């Protein structure tokens, strides 16, 4: 339909943050690369406490899609969307899986969780900068719901999105 193809052409950028407190057990941000690293933390005082990514989303992107893209962008091993499709969990049930949720912080609201099926755009108090993507440009990233974004696309009224580890009884399946 014309509407859904137009929705995929309209994009906006979010700022997504991951704090070191939301890394799986025995992981830390590498002091040089910033990537999550498994093992014993080095005895360095200046380990990064957070990492940020800018993601350009299709207008109709869901919270679950952002969580999946965040897991990939931050290179989190064995991580899945909390409340997402359990088919993959059943096929790989022998491995512990960290489940992640998405929270939002804005000037008008304290941090609060977002439902995985909800649209990201619905979380905004004020609409973000919506940009049409030139469909004549033959780039693979146009086919995806999520693509890399840039800081310049973030407005001062835009909220901060936070990737959080699910903090409940099934935080990590298979881990006692």
Stretch-by-stretch model annotation:
Residues 1-176:
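Intrinsically disordered, Pro/Ser/Thr-rich cytosolic linker and juxtamembrane tail regions that serve as
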């Amino acid at each position: 339909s014309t509407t859904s193809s137009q929705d995929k052409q309209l994009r906006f950028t979010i700022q997504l943050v991951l704090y070191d407190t939301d890394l799986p057990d025995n992981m830390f941000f590498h002091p040089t690369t910033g990537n999550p690293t498994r093992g014993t933390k080095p005895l360095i005082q200046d380990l990064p406490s957070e990492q940020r990514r800018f993601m350009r989303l299709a207008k109709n992107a869901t919270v679950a899609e952002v969580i999946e893209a965040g897991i990939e962008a931050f290179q989190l091993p064995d991580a899945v969307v909390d409340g997402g499709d359990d088919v993959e969990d059943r096929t790989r049930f022998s491995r512990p899986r960290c489940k992640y949720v998405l929270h939002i912080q804005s000037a008008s609201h304290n941090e609060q969780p977002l439902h995985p099926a909800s649209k990201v755009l619905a979380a905004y108090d004020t609409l973000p900068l919506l940009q049409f993507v030139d469909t004549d440009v033959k780039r693979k990233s146009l086919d995806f719901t999520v693509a890399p974004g840039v800081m310049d696309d973030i407005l001062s009224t835009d909220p901060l999105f936070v990737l959080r580890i699910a903090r409940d009884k099934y935080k990590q399946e298979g881990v006692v």
